[in-house]
Amino acid sequence: MVSRKPALAVKELGCISDRDLRQLQRWNLRAATPATDQLMHEIIHQRALEFPEKIAVEAWNGTFTYQQLDRLASHLASCLASRGIGSNDFVPISFHKSRWAIVAMLAVNKSGAAFVPVDPSLPAGRVIHILRQTEARVALACDKRSTAMSEAGISVITVADSMDCEHLDKPLWSPSFPGHNAPAYCLFTSGSTGEPKGCVVGHAAFASIASHSQSAYIHSGSRVLQFASLGFGMGLFEVFCTLSTGATLCIPSDEDRMNCLAHAMTSMNVTWTILSPTTLSTLSPADMDCLVTVVTGGEPLSESQVTVWAPHVRLLQLYGLTECSGMFTVSDQIFSSDNPERNIGYPISGRCWIADPQDHHRLRAIGAVGELLIDTPNLAQNYLHNPAKTAAAFISPPGWIEDQLPARQSRPAVLYKTGDLARFNLDGSICHLGRKDHQLKVRGQRVEPGELEHHLRQLFPAVGDVVVDMACPVEANGVASLTAFILQENECSDDLFVEPTEAFLECVQSVRQSLTKIVPAYMIPNLFLRLGTMPKTVSGKKDRRRLRQEVGLLTWDRLRKYMTVDNARGRAAHTLETESEKILAQIWADLLHLDVGTLGPEDDILALGADSITAMRAVAMARIRGLGLTVSDIFATPTLAEMAQSARVVPTTAVTTHRSVSLVDDNVRELCLSHLREQTSLLDSDEQTPLILPATGMQKFFLDRSSFDYFAYILDGDVDFDRMQAACTTAVNQHSILRTVFVQNASGIFQVTLSSIPTALYHITTARNVADVSEKLWSPNTSKTVTLDHPATRFMLVSNPDAQQHALILRLSHSQYDGLSWPNLVGAIAATYNGSALSPCLQFSDYIRCRYQQDTTAGYNFWRRYLLGYTPTHMRDCTFEATTQSKAVSTDSDAVNVHHTIPSPPDTPDGITMATLIKAAGALVLGQLTRRPDIVIGQTVHGRSSLPLAGIETILGPCLNFVPIHVQIHPTWTAERFLHHVQDSHIQTTAYDYLELADIIEQSTSWAPGTSLGAIFHHQNIDTKMEISLQGMKNSKTIHHLTGSYIHQQMRSEVWVYSMPVDQGLEISIRGSSHVISAPQADELARKLGAFVQTLARHPEQALVNIMAP
């Protein structure tokens, strides 16, 4: 480096090698991202032209399509323009969580101005300061915030439902072009001088958020939670990365956001969210099957959080700054064992270097700790009206920058000094290691301790010194609390911490109250500790580290002595009296790591360390115990006695089943029973009234096929016939679906569950091969059909005593089981034969009843939105080549059955299932054959993830279902992005995949009744040939035989695409009626599907336009 730059100052050399310099240059070349030419509101306008009817915003208070959002923002922009608002103006916006907040921000940018989010929780004094700094003339606010903003001294335009301009076809607004460097927004953060500082971001930097979607795994099918405050960078990222991609933004109410976040996310079918690890800790993946991607930031993930979440979602960690629009780095997908908790990943939108924290002219070697410096198109412009702070943070590039830039690349105007300590890992990823200054992070939000210390000095009487820091008591499970250390004047003690006087504690209460009028709630300390002395370092500075360390040695019980009023006054009325008080005391003891015996009814949980996050956890825990609380209840009534009085009794959410109650009326019940008495001998005089339920759509589908399924387990060894007979009888008693018969009358098809059926084990002895004999047994039944009013369940045992070989044959109708539940039957037989007790299980009737208990409104609304404007893709819409004759065609004159095997199929990309890969390939084939960008096909789902039924996995029965899936094909997408889109689209449907297809069509679409899905994809990833483990015998072979034709009444208008792993690779079968698809066409479909499966998996970087090219 010296030879290339002889004039470089010695101080700029540092201790970095030429090899490291070259590596940094390569890493930064990979990360460089060009700025966009479009402005954010132009990008969203383009999405409105592409997807006019698609839902852009789904909020608790209504929805907007992209067209509605764009038009309303244009109308509001014209209102602003008529008031003289334009480029370089700042417009404050203040909204509770609402769809109108999105309109407001977009409108301000369309007017050419910059929006300034003002969170409704901010105290009036801070709002006035923001208005004064921005010199704003007009603000936009919701109904509830209009008065408060007006009282702050500004003209307010109220933005609410009365503004709905849907019927106005031509917007009044005419495009304004503020310029790429004009301000787009300004965010205010904590400032070290006691006042917040405004960070101004220009239009070009703002628009660059659109380029982050692929790295964040946000695509047009995503449903993104809007959780963060719009006053923080991540709140804006949630909104504008979503809208610039054509995805849907989901906005719960403030109440749901704080009190029942998991429920809100599930009801809105959220697939993507960004949350701080602290907030994430209040949730469980078990409660949100809809979630696909979880991104965290602001704090490091704990190892326990990775363990909990990584197996269930795509887990990422990002790094962003207020001074950098959107994300700057994002990690690879995090798995349980291979990602350090502080690894923030790789730059996605610029370049970075790590320099000496005390001298940014000196670069640090790879692996050494230093200050992170960044250069990115996303960078903010300045701190509003604060040139000194701007100059200190946005620096001229040091001399070493020239050596780091590739040829013909322009020198950056500035670098941003983040103040964050970091180091490069050997793979180019970055580890975040804290701050070089005293800046704090509270639940992911930036806090300058100097600002709080300034206010505390003014508010505390007779204060000698103050320190604000994050401190973590020993029993806090690693959760640090914002802590104020107060040294009063004339205080003199050898003890670091001293017990508070009554006057001190009363002063703390007064100071808390005053702070609520000055700073945001998250900046109010949880703990106030009185000091006997202020520890100092050898250089005479306040020893913050020692204060943190000493708090880290305190148990909660010892800490209470330094912070509660009761300790100073003497404890009064300590006994918990009501059941609600006792329940709440146990909840808070668990959350705050206290001995429940030390809590009394007058204890203030806020004084004991509670905050909004622990309050959210308390709300959820209380609901489970039957108490209804909200976060606002907790803050309004912080003592246990008051809280117990404000709590409401709520029902628990467990599903209650009543097996003696039917879902059919008395007339239908009597018709069913009369039929069985007349046609069968199954009901005798001692028979209790059996359970009668409607047959599900899937049961009707399988009954229409009118065929039996046979499973033959070839067993080598000695069999105990009596034990086998008893095992089969026990299985029938265990699973009521095996005792079910079907009855059809004018009202439909119904299933009748009997208390018992004949369960004889038919025994056949032979000298021949038992497998051959078994096949002979079911061959004569090929033309027979399932009789509705007779049990399908039958057990047979074929034995060759000389060969000590047997075949245990189970016969059922597919209306009694599905692949996922088959092991429940086999396991029951094996457990009983082997002498083990059976575990309790639910019945298929519990599943049906749970389905009927669901409120279907949200489900039908989802399907209505999901399928709006789309229709199924049919074979008649395809243009086939159809030149190759199939080599494997069914002999059934009406049936086409083509097989295609992919030898050595490729592994699926990370995070993608084989079912997704096959559906994606199928959608591409249909897109190519129809030349359509939107494909709707059918998919088989197991139907067990969407119902709140604990133990649903123990049910034997056909819970599977057929539902539509909508796939979009964007030619510029890479294969990887397309695969994630297909998988995310599937996951969206899982919350409501229990609904009957016929009902979805009737309630949620304009399709004709009985519309077929065109093509239905079914990936068989369950081994129906699983072994049965019986004592003294070896299961040497399993045979699965399906009788009857593949084509029956309900299959005559659809093509079925089956896929299954086999020993030779992956087998793909195309089945259907010859009236729908010919054998050559089916062969063409199978071949193309196989080719696309391999290309998508092996070339994830390839664009769809190239993959689909003829």
UniProtKB/Swiss-Prot annotation:
Question: Taxonomically, which superkingdom?
Answer: Eukaryota
Region span, Adenylation:
47-443
CDD domains xrefs: A_NRPS_SidN3_like, CT_NRPS-like
- The record's region (Condensation) falls at 713-1025
Q: In which pathway does it act?
A: Secondary metabolite biosynthesis
> Which InterPro entries does the entry link to?
AA_adenyl_dom, ACP-like_sf, AMP-bd_C_sf, AMP-dep_synth/lig_dom, ANL_N_sf, CAT-like_dom_sf, Condensatn, PP-bd_ACP
Q: What is its EC number?
A: 6.3.1.-
* Gene ablation phenotype (knockout): Leads to the accumulation of the benzomalvin dipeptide precursor anthranilate-N-methylphenylalanine (Anth-NmPhe).
In this UniProt entry, the residues modified to O-(pantetheine 4'-phosphoryl)serine are S612
Which UniProt keywords are present, listed alphabetically?
Ligase, Phosphopantetheine, Phosphoprotein
UniProt-listed Pfam families:
AMP-binding, Condensation, PP-binding
GO CC terms in record: cytoplasm
Q: Which GO terms describe its molecular function?
A: ligase activity; phosphopantetheine binding
Q: Which GO terms describe its biological process?
A: amino acid activation for nonribosomal peptide biosynthetic process; secondary metabolite biosynthetic process
Q: Where is the Carrier domain?
A: 575-651
Domain comment, as recorded: NRP synthetases are composed of discrete domains (adenylation (A), thiolation (T) or peptidyl carrier protein (PCP) and condensation (C) domains) which when grouped together are referred to as a single module. Each module is responsible for the recognition (via the A domain) and incorporation of a single amino acid into the growing peptide product. Thus, an NRP synthetase is generally composed of one or more modules and can terminate in a thioesterase domain (TE) that releases the newly synthesized peptide from the enzyme.
Q: Relate the protein's function as given in its record.
A: Nonribisomal peptide synthetase; part of the gene cluster that mediates the biosynthesis of benzomalvin A and D. The pathway begins with the loading of amino acid precursors onto the A domains of the non ribosomal peptide synthetases benY and benZ. BenY and the A1 domain of benZ are loaded with anthranilate (Anth), while the A2 domain of benZ is loaded with phenylalanine (Phe). N-methylation of Phe by the methyltransferase benX may happen before loading of Phe onto benZ, after loading of Phe, or after dipeptide formation.
Give the family, as the similarity comment puts it: Belongs to the NRP synthetase family.
* Name assigned to this protein: Nonribisomal peptide synthetase benY
Q: Which gene encodes it?
A: benY
